[in-house]
């Protein structure tokens, strides 16, 4: 039983201001210099490489230096074209694009009938007025951001068709002036601080002897709590070759295995190291961990395999499949949140019922479709020319998966996913950690 992907009800974008002032200025040619096709192409590439970061600065892991996003865009243009654009010129160009886009949007909304949507009634006129006011309060960054714009414009009574699609991707919440940034997030792709692979509390046993028979071998050694075990997880692309032939490519994969008591316990990572990479508001990772149980929280580092050619989109299917096992008969709810810079972008909630098999209860989420955001994300990653550029993007992209008992709301599993691109020819790889707080 699957639900649709949904966006947050309210935008979680940049704090930078000046949107309404930008709308009042006439649209002139970019006074900061001509943006030739090669510069414009590099500018668009840089927007994809360096995702929006609000008031934060970005630390390049290979240099250890802090940059505002506009500084990084200017730096990228210089590296790609040999031509110089300052961060102020980048900021000016963003404002020019935003003013142009705002005029287009306002022109659409000012029509009496927009995409067959009648504003003649008082209720409809109120929705239109709210939309106009919303645009007037948006920053330049939000206007050219597809995600931020659609979130901001998700007003009651105003359908999506009433405003035009905003082109671009990863163009959300651009910092207006990188130099004024104060919220520095010093998170780089350095190895996590690990703790020894010691037995979990409650599972200690003499060396060489298994715990009591009531404690299964997978506890503490796999993605598993005392009530639910993830057997398998995969995100994949299926492409139809002919009527009866399909080619399946695994982007990420956790395969089935048979753990034994002789296997080492999972290494532990302090959950506070990753708090800022996931939502912090109500229902976020911190609150979930405080609620417990402690043995239900895991970090999975994926090295994704993007080495595939997408030949025909019309014959392609992007999906996720997962399997779980439990000693208990219950109804589970699986929430999957896609996050950028710690902010939720989209969420999917699925409900699954148990099937009794061989003395246990099995749960299968089979071929759940990926959302459009994720499909676009994969396409943009694949078009970046270098793996280090892909990893720079992925450094601020995370997924939070929470599996709960639908009836009791107890957390059964909470899995934080972080990503890099696989540098191996052997496909996708992964490593699993326990999340702890000492």
Swiss-Prot record:
Coiled coil: none annotated. Residues 1-18 have a biased composition (Polar residues). Enriched in cardiac and skeletal muscle. Keywords: Activator, DNA-binding, Nucleus, Transcription, Transcription regulation. GO terms for cellular component: nucleus; transcription regulator complex. GO terms for molecular function: DNA-binding transcription factor activity, RNA polymerase II-specific; RNA polymerase II cis-regulatory region sequence-specific DNA binding. Gene3D superfamilies: 2.70.50.80, TEA/ATTS domain (6.10.20.40). It holds the Pfam family YBD. Its main location: nucleus. This is Transcriptional enhancer factor TEF-3. It comes from Gallus gallus (Chicken).
């Amino acid at each position: 039983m699957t639900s649709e992907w949904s966006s947050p009800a309210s935008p979680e974008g940049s704090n930078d201001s000046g949107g309404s002032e930008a709308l009042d200025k006439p649209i002139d040619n970019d006074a900061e210099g001509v943006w030739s096709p090669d510069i414009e192409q590099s500018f668009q590439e840089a927007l994809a490489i360096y995702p929006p970061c609000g008031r934060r600065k970005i630390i390049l892991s290979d240099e250890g230096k802090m940059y505002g996003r506009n500084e990084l865009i200017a730096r990228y243009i210089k590296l790609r074209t040999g031509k110089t654009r300052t961060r102020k010129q980048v900021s000016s160009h963003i404002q020019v694009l935003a003013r142009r886009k705002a005029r287009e949007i306002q022109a659409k909304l000012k029509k009496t009938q927009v995409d067959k949507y009648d504003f003649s009634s008082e209720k409809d006129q109120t929705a239109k007025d709210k939309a106009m006011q919303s645009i007037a309060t948006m920053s330049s960054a939000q206007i050219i951001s597809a995600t931020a714009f659609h979130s901001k414009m998700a007003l009651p009574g105003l359908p999506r068709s009433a405003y035009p699609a905003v082109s671009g991707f990863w163009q959300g919440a651009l910092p207006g002036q990188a130099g004024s940034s104060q919220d520095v997030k010093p998170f780089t792709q350095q190895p996590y601080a690990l703790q020894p692979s010691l037995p979990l509390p409650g599972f200690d046993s003499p060396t060489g002897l298994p715990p009591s028979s009531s404690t299964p071998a997978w506890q503490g050694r796999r993605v598993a709590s005392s009530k639910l075990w993830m057997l398998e997880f995969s995100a994949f692309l299926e492409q139809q070759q002919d009527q009866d032939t399909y080619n399946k490519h695994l982007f990420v994969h956790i395969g089935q295995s048979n753990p034994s008591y002789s296997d080492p316990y999972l290494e532990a990572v302090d959950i506070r190291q990753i708090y800022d990479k996931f939502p912090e508001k109500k229902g976020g990772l911190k609150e979930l961990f405080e609620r417990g149980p402690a043995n239900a929280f895991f970090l999975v580092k994926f090295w994704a395999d993007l080495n595939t050619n997408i030949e025909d989109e019309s014959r392609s299917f992007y999906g996720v499949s997962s399997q779980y096992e439990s000693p208990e008969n219950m109804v589970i709810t699986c929430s999957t949140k896609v996050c950028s810079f710690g902010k939720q972008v989209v969420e999917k909630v699925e409900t699954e019922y148990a099937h009794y098999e061989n003395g246990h209860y099995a749960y299968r989420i089979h071929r759940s479709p990926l959302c459009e955001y994720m499909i676009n994300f994969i396409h943009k990653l694949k078009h970046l020319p270098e793996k280090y550029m892909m990893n720079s993007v992925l450094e601020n992209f995370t997924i939070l998966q929470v599996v709960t008992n639908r009836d009791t709301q107890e957390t059964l599993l909470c899995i934080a996913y972080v990503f890099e691109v696989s540098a191996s020819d052997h496909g996708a790889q992964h490593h699993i950690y326990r999340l702890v707080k000492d």
